[in-house]
Regions:
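Structural core segment of the AMP-binding/adenylate-forming
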Residues: 7, 48-49, 72, 76-134, ...
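Conserved pre-ATP/AMP-binding loop-to-beta segment of ANL
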Residues: 13-16, 137-154, 161, 184-190
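Conserved AMP-binding/adenylate-forming core of the ANL superfamily
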Residues: 18-64, 68-72, 89-94, 98, ...
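Conserved AMP-binding A3 loop
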Residues: 29-33, 150-174
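AMP-binding/adenylate-forming catalytic core of the ANL superfamily
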Residues: 88, 105, 241, 364-454, ...
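Conserved AMP-binding/adenylation subdomain of ANL enzymes
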Residues: 173-193, 197-240, 254
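Gly/Ser/Thr-rich phosphate-binding loop
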Residues: 238-243, 252-310, 323
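Conserved ATP/PPi-binding loop(s) of AMP-dependent carboxylate-activating enzymes
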Residues: 317-321, 328-355, 390
Length: 482
């Protein structure tokens, strides 16, 4: 198997693969012939610089065709690609490099300052350099096995540092299940998954799942703007729109909704959508938002099927062939039935093969009499904000680096638009006073220390943190007091 050969090279060369809407307003259509050639020449360029099967290539590129071709070039060589979101800070990037030891970093030139500050100690190439996509060498696609490594993505990190999740080649082919039964584009459709490059959902739904169904992908390399989002859906005649729950919430709250002429499917994943948002979208567009569920380690496990019964608030049923059950309130999966299940973790702290036996998701889920599943919350303390999964440990670590902070605990606080936001309860060192000015200073400090979406939007002061007898912070008490 090889995704580059079996899907990209095998497609009709003249068929539409990508519609590019660049940050500067440019628009360009890319045919499969152009994508295949650009990826093959980039693969040749990388091979000449020592990249081969099993080597890790990190990308730090926005939602641009160059990112897609870099991914396909890695698939072509059998290299392992680690797409990173552009929001990462130098400390995030340095930590990732320390875990995965990339042979090469491919980056957007707009991220040059961040990469230079990270001082990664490995070769970095920028996608605007001459010869990357139009060089003389064309690499042939190697033959790969389902369990050969393919893709790396990082978890959010709940009890410690984020873990590097390693997927095999089967992860790519395995997307056919959710592509058919949940995303569900038709051949020739235009699909827009708005997730930024580097996130788990973007790796599978921006272009992999659409191409498996014979559809094209829209790439929009710009910040989220509610009005612009709807205008672009109409102008580009998007057929299937895949957005984060927060994006659906914000658009419903800030922009008058209307039906789009070509739009036939709305899907969402990452966290539950409240009934009022679902009602507003369906009333305005005539379309239900079909929810789905998955994890970094598992890929997608459930989905509300296209054309089937819709249960508001449900994340659907298990995808065909996937065996799920609930044990003591927690959703559990049989890895043998999950074609996109991961191979294991990388790194000294989380290294090793994927655990054998049932996979405990750590999510509390209930099931109704008809098998529809409803997400109730995490069994651990992960915060889901605007679709981002944020581990409290990382935010707490950033806060306690500030000279004013003695201790800090981070929990979720409810928010009408983002679902939840990060709430920090801070114990100050002697000589410091909790003021609005200090709260803003801690927020800016956290933004500088880690990815900006992780900063605490709510900062509160406490004389001490509630703890167990063994000294562990009782976050449940903090959540209940918020």
């Amino acid at each position: 198997m090889n995704f580059a050969r079996d899907v990209v090279d095998a497609a009709d060369p003249s068929a539409l693969a990508l519609v590019e809407r660049a940050r500067d307003g440019r628009r360009r259509e890319w045919r499969f012939a152009e994508v295949a050639e650009g990826a093959a020449r980039l693969a040749g360029w990388m091979r000449a610089r020592g990249v081969g099967r099993g080597d890790v290539v990190m990308t730090l590129v926005g939602n641009r065709p160059e990112w897609v071709m870099a991914m396909v070039a890695c698939f072509r060589l059998g290299a392992v690609v680690l797409p990173c979101p552009e929001q990462l800070r130098p400390t995030d990037l340095a930590r990732s490099v320390g875990v995965v030891s990339p042979t090469l970093v491919l980056a957007d030139p707009r991220n040059r300052a961040t990469l230079e500050a990270a001082a990664l100690g490995c070769p970095v190439a920028y996608v605007d350099e001459s010869g990357l996509f139009d060089g003389p060498d064309v690499a042939e696609a190697v033959t790969l096995r389902p369990l050969d490594p393919c893709l790396l993505t990082f978890t959010s990190g709940t009890a410690g540092e984020p873990k590097a999740v390693l997927h095999g080649q089967r992860y790519l082919a395995g997307q056919a299940v959710q592509a058919e039964h949940w995303l569900a584009p038709a051949r020739g459709d235009l699909v827009w998954c708005t997730a930024a490059s580097g996130w788990s959902k973007s790796a599978r739904n921006v272009f992999i799942a659409p191409w498996l169904r014979g559809a094209a992908a829209l790439l929009h390399d710009a910040r989220f703007d509610p009005a612009a989002r709807l205008e672009l859906v109409e102008r580009e005649r998007v057929a299937v729109l895949c957005m984060a729950p927060t994006e659906y919430r914000v658009i419903a709250a800030r922009v008058p909704l209307r039906a789009a002429p070509a739009l036939r499917g709305l899907v969402s994943a990452g966290e539950a959508l409240n009934p009022e948002v679902l009602r507003i979208w369906q009333q305005a567009t005539g379309l239900p938002i079909r929810d789905g569920y998955g994890q970094t380690e598992t890929g997608q496990l459930t989905g509300m099927p296209a054309g089937g019964e819709i249960r508001p608030g449900s994340m659907g049923r298990a995808l065909p062939g996937t065996r799920l059950w609930i044990e003591d309130g927690e959703l559990v999966a049989d890895p043998a039935t999950v074609p996109t299940f991961f191979l294991g973790y990388l790194g000294a702290d989380g290294g090793g093969e994927a655990p054998g036996g049932p996979w405990r998701t750590g999510d509390r889920v209930r099931e109704d009499a008809d098998g529809f599943l409803f997400f109730e919350g995490r069994t651990d303390d992960v915060i889901i904000s605007a679709g981002y999964r944020i581990g409290p440990f990382e935010v707490e670590s950033a806060l306690v680096e500030h000279p004013a902070v003695a201790e800090a605990a981070v929990v979720a606080a409810p928010d009408a638009e983002r679902g939840s936001v990060v709430r920090a309860v801070v114990v100050l060192r002697s000589g410091f006073t909790g003021t609005p000015e200090l709260a803003r200073e801690l927020q800016e400090h956290t933004k500088a220390a880690t990815a900006p979406y992780k900063y605490p939007r709510v900062v509160e002061w406490a004389d001490e943190l509630p703890k167990t007898a063994s000294g562990k912070v009782r976050r449940a008490v903090l959540r209940d007091s918020g």
